[in-house]
Amino acid sequence: MNKILDQIRTEHPLVICYTNDVVKNFTANGLLSLGASPTMSEAPQEAEDFYPVAGSVLINIGTLTKHHEHAMLENAKIANETETPLVFDPVAVGASKYRKDFCKYFLKKIKPTVIKGNASEILALIDDTATMKGTDSADNLDVVDIAEKAYKEYQTAIILTGETDVIVQDNKVVKLSNGSHFLAKITGAGCLLGAVVGAFLFRNTHPSIETLIEAVSVYNIAAERAEQLSDSKGPGTFLTQFIDALYRIDSDAVAENCNLEEVK
């Protein structure tokens, strides 16, 4: 492990979050607990001031509207122009033609550093016939194949989330198997992960696969610890313990507990 978590705790990188209305509070609190500095900025008018000093930018389309379309594209354009790392989260992209059309257009105009989504979302980016319900992952999909095809099409790092997470970068593929079933029972779990990934980028527009492994593992191992601390009482208790676990987790715990399989 690169121990970038230690760097986050000492440098408190600024993560610009243009995220959806449902998860803003949860995302900000999660980043603060981790040690990062969130700013929930959406105005392109201030992007030229914020982005050059930011560690990364997250764009999450969860509550996409016509108003957000323009602002997201403008902000993403400025991120590319200022060489600020960009995490793109195409939430529920397969749920409607509107979302899919926007994401396809966005990815033609913009170069993300990382695309993060579940299997159904990543599949929808590479298969025009794919559909989905809400933000839930589809079952019985070849997640490694989907992630590799998305990587080849968009030439950017792919983080495909699910019961087993798949990361593709620099033609390397790994599977990660940490996490908690409670993550599927709280809203915004995947959305916060996108922001956490951003916290690990530190203005690196081509992060190593090791960096991405650490980011996802910190998140998932914190979730495992939260489940243990909450004594499986339920999602509400887990949610509180998860924020605490992000605050408490350290690099040694991540290195010791990371459940990783190198696919290629």
UniProtKB/Swiss-Prot annotation:
Q: Which reaction does it catalyse?
A: 5-(2-hydroxyethyl)-4-methylthiazole + ATP = 4-methyl-5-(2-phosphooxyethyl)-thiazole + ADP + H(+)
The Gene Ontology terms for molecular function here are: ATP binding; hydroxyethylthiazole kinase activity; magnesium ion binding
- State the source organism's domain of life: Bacteria
**Coiled-coil regions, chain positions:** none
Quote any Pfam family the record assigns. HK
- The residues the record assigns to binding ATP are K116, T161
Q: EC number(s) in its UniProt entry?
A: 2.7.1.50
Binding-site list for substrate: M40, G188
- Which cofactors does the annotated protein need, by name? Mg(2+)
User: Which pathway is it part of?
Assistant: Cofactor biosynthesis; thiamine diphosphate biosynthesis; 4-methyl-5-(2-phosphoethyl)-thiazole from 5-(2-hydroxyethyl)-4-methylthiazole: step 1/1
Q: Give GO terms for biological process.
A: thiamine biosynthetic process; thiamine diphosphate biosynthetic process
Its biological purpose is as follows: Catalyzes the phosphorylation of the hydroxyl group of 4-methyl-5-beta-hydroxyethylthiazole (THZ).
HAMAP family per the UniProt record, alphabetical: Thz_kinase
Q: Give the UniProt family note.
A: Belongs to the Thz kinase family.
* Protein name in UniProt: Hydroxyethylthiazole kinase
Species, as recorded: Staphylococcus carnosus (strain TM300)
